[in-house]
C-alpha cells in the first residue's frame, strides 16, 4: 500500500516536460500490478491504480503508456432512431474497429465517424502488438 501512495505522489508532481519518453501505444486494461517495461516505447499492458488517469509510469513518474479509455469497452449502440449512418466502434472482443450503422440518436462514446478516429482513440496497437503479454525476443 505504501508503494501505491508513493506512486500517486509521483503522478501528482512530475510534469510531462520532465519526462524522458513520449507516451507509448494504447492497450486495454489488464490485471493491475506494477511492472517496468522492457523498452521505453513498448507498453507491457498493465495499469497502475495509483495514478488517476491510469497511465503506466517510468521510474521518474513519467507516462510511457496510456491505458485504453473505458469508452472503448462499451458495446456498439445503434440507438432508437431509424437513420442508417455508417459509423465505427471498437469491438473489445475482436480488438478491432468495426463498421456499424448508427440510428442517428442517443449514441454512446464508442461511436466514431471514421475508422481512423476509432483506431486513434481506442488503439491501433493491437495490430502491431496483438499479444501484449508475450515478450518478443527478436
Curated annotation (Swiss-Prot):
Entry's localization field: Secreted
S-S bridge residues: 72-122, 81-105, 97-118
Main location group: secreted
This protein's UniProt keywords: Disulfide bond, Protease inhibitor, Secreted, Serine protease inhibitor, Signal
UniProt domain BPTI/Kunitz inhibitor: residue ranges: 72-122
A Pfam family assignment: Kunitz_BPTI
Any one annotated GO CC term: extracellular space
Span of the signal peptide: 1-19
Tissues in which the protein is found: Prismatic layer of shell (at protein level). Expressed primarily in the mantle with highest level in the mantle edge and lower level in the mantle pallium.
SMART domains, alphabetized: KU
Gene Ontology MF annotations: serine-type endopeptidase inhibitor activity
Name this polypeptide is given: BPTI/Kunitz domain-containing protein 1
Organism: Pinctada maxima (Silver-lipped pearl oyster)
Amino acid at each position: 500500500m505504501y508503494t501505491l501512495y508513493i506512486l500517486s505522489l509521483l503522478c501528482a508532481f512530475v510534469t510531462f516536460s520532465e519526462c524522458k519518453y513520449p507516451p507509448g501505444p494504447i492497450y486495454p486494461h489488464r490485471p493491475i500490478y506494477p511492472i517496468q517495461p522492457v523498452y521505453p516505447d513498448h507498453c507491457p499492458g498493465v495499469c497502475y491504480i495509483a495514478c488517476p488517469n491510469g497511465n503506466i509510469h517510468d521510474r521518474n513518474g513519467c507516462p510511457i503508456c496510456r491505458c485504453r479509455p473505458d469508452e472503448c469497452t462499451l458495446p456498439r449502440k445503434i440507438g432508437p432512431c431509424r437513420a442508417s449512418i455508417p459509423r465505427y466502434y471498437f469491438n473489445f472482443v475482436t480488438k478491432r474497429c468495426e463498421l456499424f450503422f448508427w440510428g442517428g440518436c442517443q449514441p454512446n462514446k464508442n461511436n466514431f465517424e471514421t475508422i481512423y478516429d476509432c483506431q486513434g482513440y481506442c488503439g491501433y496497437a493491437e495490430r502491431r502488438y496483438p499479444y501484449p503479454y508475450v515478450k518478443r525476443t527478436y
